Amino acid sequence: MQNRRLTALTLFLLLLSLLLPPLARAQNVNQQLAAGSVLETIKKRGALKVGMSTFVPWAMRDKNGELIGYEIDVAKRLAEDMGVKAEFVPTAWDGIIPALLTGKFDLIIGGLSITPERNLTVNFTAPYANSGIQMVANKNLATGFKTLADFDKPEVVLAARRGATPATAAKRLIPKATLRQFDEDALALQEVLNGKAHAFVTSTPTPAFEALKHPDTLFLPMPEPFVQGAEGFALRKGDPDALNFFNNWILLRQQDGWLKERHDYWFKTRDWTDRAVE
């Protein structure tokens, strides 16, 4: 009996000695991952660096030169909940993902649509907003245009922001049209207002807002978006802790109604227009 007990104890100790190193190694790996998370960088710095680009009503300047918009509210609330301040890094849209990858900022909160191509390069959170792609057209140039087929002709000129999802959608769905791309939405819109392009392809709700703002010049050829999309925060790959935190933050702000309230204010009302620069 005593020999059997001794044998069992020996086997238990042997098994324990085999298990402890892997457990210790796993714990060490977890500690290293946590220490390497951008969350730790943000906390030590005391600031959340956010990459963004101006895009009404996501982000824009007010009459005092300060940034306002849906994304700005989201980033400020996120930083507040983390106990840090928000720092915004305005970036050209076609270079915003490369800038994230080189560490110019911690994440992108900038109306960035989730696409498979982008997701191969960066990680996306769950959607915190949903928008669509629509166009606003010049009344003189696009008289009678009501479908995508009406615009799908070589003599038709479309304007869009360079590198943005609407430009990609225009290439795919209206391939015969001539597409001109601009660094800013305002420049693309101006091309249509000046009668140099038939339509401006962009994300909702901009087309409807601009049609209301310029009723003598612009109209909505199609009342509904022709592509639906979803926007998420983008962050560098290999950071599961940060992805988990941001996903849960979005979930909680959806559950308490804060994201919807802010989204409705910026996307379904024009109460903010007096604050924005024309």
Question: Which residues does each predicted region cover?
Answer:
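Alpha-to-beta junction loops
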Residues: 48-49, 84-85, 102-110, 155-157, ...
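A ligand-binding cleft/hinge motif common to bilobed small-molecule-binding domains
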Residues: 95, 112-121, 169-172, 193-194, ...
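Flexible hinge/capping segments at coil-to-helix
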Residues: 139-156
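Ligand-binding clefts/hinges and TM-proximal coupling segments of bilobed small-molecule sensing domains
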Residues: 27-33, 165-179, 250-278
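Periplasmic-binding protein-like
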Residues: 130-137, 204, 208-251, 269-278
